């Protein structure tokens, strides 16, 4: 018997996958706090991978969650076999404040 173990990446991975509306709410929280979102992807999705590939540049001028969601969709289309996550950075404290997975390949 083959047992498939699903990887857990962060807190949200213990919940059902986030839909676009839930992702938009998280993005709205980040933007309303002045955080700069960025999209990263990895083909292995290993938690121990410290460096994921950055999709384009961080979205410093993003005003709405829809802008970020459209970039997430573009990343999914370009790399359908990659894990995709959103990270947000606080430029005042110069730290990463938020990170969550938005797409896992089948």
Curated annotation (Swiss-Prot):
Q: Which GO terms describe its molecular function?
A: ribulose-bisphosphate carboxylase activity
- Subcellular locations according to the entry: Plastid, Cyanelle
Against InterPro entries, the record matches this protein to: RuBisCO_ssu (IPR024681), RuBisCO_ssu_dom (IPR000894), RuBisCO_ssu_sf (IPR036385)
Q: How is this protein annotated for GO cellular component?
A: chloroplast; cyanelle
Query: What keywords are assigned to this protein?
Result: Calvin cycle, Carbon dioxide fixation, Cyanelle, Photorespiration, Photosynthesis, Plastid
Q: Which Pfam families match?
A: RuBisCO_small
GO-annotated biological processes: reductive pentose-phosphate cycle
**Signal peptide per UniProt:** none
Just give the chief location class: plastid
Q: List the disulfide bonds.
A: none
**Function in brief:** RuBisCO catalyzes two reactions: the carboxylation of D-ribulose 1,5-bisphosphate, the primary event in carbon dioxide fixation, as well as the oxidative fragmentation of the pentose substrate. Both reactions occur simultaneously and in competition at the same active site. Although the small subunit is not catalytic it is essential for maximal activity.
Task: Give the record's subunit note.
Answer: Heterohexadecamer of 8 large and 8 small subunits.
Q: What else is known?
A: The basic functional RuBisCO is composed of a large chain homodimer in a 'head-to-tail' conformation. In form I RuBisCO this homodimer is arranged in a barrel-like tetramer with the small subunits forming a tetrameric 'cap' on each end of the 'barrel'.
Regarding protein family, the annotation reads:
Belongs to the RuBisCO small chain family.
Q: What is this protein called?
A: Ribulose bisphosphate carboxylase small subunit
Q: Which organism is it from?
A: Cyanophora paradoxa
């Amino acid at each position: 018997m083959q047992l498939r173990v699903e990887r857990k990446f962060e807190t949200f991975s213990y919940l059902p996958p986030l839909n676009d509306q839930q992702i938009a709410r998280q993005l709205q929280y980040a933007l309303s706090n002045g955080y700069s979102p960025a999209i990263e992807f990895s083909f292995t999705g290993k938690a121990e991978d410290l460096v994921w590939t950055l999709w384009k540049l961080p979205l410093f001028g993003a005003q709405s969650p829809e802008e970020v969601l459209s970039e997430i969709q573009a990343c999914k289309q370009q790399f359908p076999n990659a894990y995709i996550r959103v990270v947000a950075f606080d430029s005042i404290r110069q730290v990463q404040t938020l990170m969550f997975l938005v797409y896992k390949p089948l």
